[in-house]
């Protein structure tokens, strides 16, 4: 089993033309809407549960994924949604306001953790807050979560998602984006990077031995 992470540039001034055309076409064809929030409490109330339910629905077919329990979902909604910069969170809904796609990203905390040697005290908390909320951020962002409802996969919904997010990344001064580990054989997620300059710079292998 092979999983890899990819880094992509997001500094270009314009979204690729083909990418933009696909996103506009998909939005009209399926009557999709982009939803943005400015309140963590509001997004948690409206879509907190649905975000992680969609994650379970989209990821369950993938090798090694264990669906989140209701207790875990409740904890993530309470702990993580309030600390996100909601400019970097995009929801896509259908005509009935049902969630069909979500993208969640945040500034990379790697540099902050390096400065504090992985410790929260005495100053580790400051570096983390600086990375998350202050104007001078890291140049790298982490693509934490992209989930698409199964019946909308392979239809270009990802293009609509990133057409909304990329201008935000540029405005905030990010240069690179890094994905979470992706299965090499997951063609759906690999295909979404076809329109970007990417570099695979990490690789993980899992070896399985049958025990008799």
What are these regions (language model features)?
Residues 4-5, 192-203:
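Conserved acetyl-CoA-binding loop of GNAT-fold acetyltransferases
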Residues 37-147:
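A conserved beta-strand-loop-helix scaffold within acyl/acetyltransferase catalytic domains
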Residues 18-45:
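Conserved N-terminal entry element of GNAT/NAT acetyltransferase domains
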Residues 140, 144-148, 153-167:
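Conserved acetyl-CoA-binding loop-helix of GNAT-fold acetyltransferases
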Residues 1-7, 11:
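Single conserved hydrophobic/aromatic residue that forms the stacking wall/gate
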Residues 140-141, 169-182:
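Conserved GNAT acetyl-CoA-binding A-motif
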Residues 148-153, 179-189:
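Conserved beta-strand-loop-alpha-helix junction that forms the acyl-donor binding cleft
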Residues 9-26, 197, 204-212:
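C-terminal "cap" of GNAT-fold acetyltransferases
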């Amino acid at each position: 089993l092979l999983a890899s992470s990819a880094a992509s540039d997001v500094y270009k001034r314009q979204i690729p033309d083909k990418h933009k055309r696909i996103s506009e076409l998909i939005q009209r064809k399926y009557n999709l809407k982009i939803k943005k929030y400015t309140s963590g409490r509001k997004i948690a109330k409206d879509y907190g549960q649905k975000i992680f339910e969609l994650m379970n629905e989209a990821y369950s077919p993938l090798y090694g994924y264990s669906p989140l329990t209701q207790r875990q979902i409740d904890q993530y909604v309470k702990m993580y949604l309030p600390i996100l910069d909601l400019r970097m969170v995009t929801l896509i809904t259908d005509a009935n306001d049902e969630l069909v796609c979500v993208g969640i990203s945040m500034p990379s905390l790697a540099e902050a953790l390096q400065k504090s040697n992985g410790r929260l005290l005495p100053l580790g908390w400051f570096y983390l807050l600086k990375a998350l909320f202050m104007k001078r951020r890291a140049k790298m962002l982490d693509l934490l979560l992209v989930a698409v409802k199964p019946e909308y996969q392979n239809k270009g919904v990802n293009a609509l998602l990133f057409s909304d997010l990329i201008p935000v990344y540029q405005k905030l001064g990010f240069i690179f984006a890094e994905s979470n580990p992706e299965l090499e054989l997951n063609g759906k997620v690999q295909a979404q990077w076809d329109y970007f300059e990417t570099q695979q710079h990490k690789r993980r292998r899992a070896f399985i031995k049958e025990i008799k």
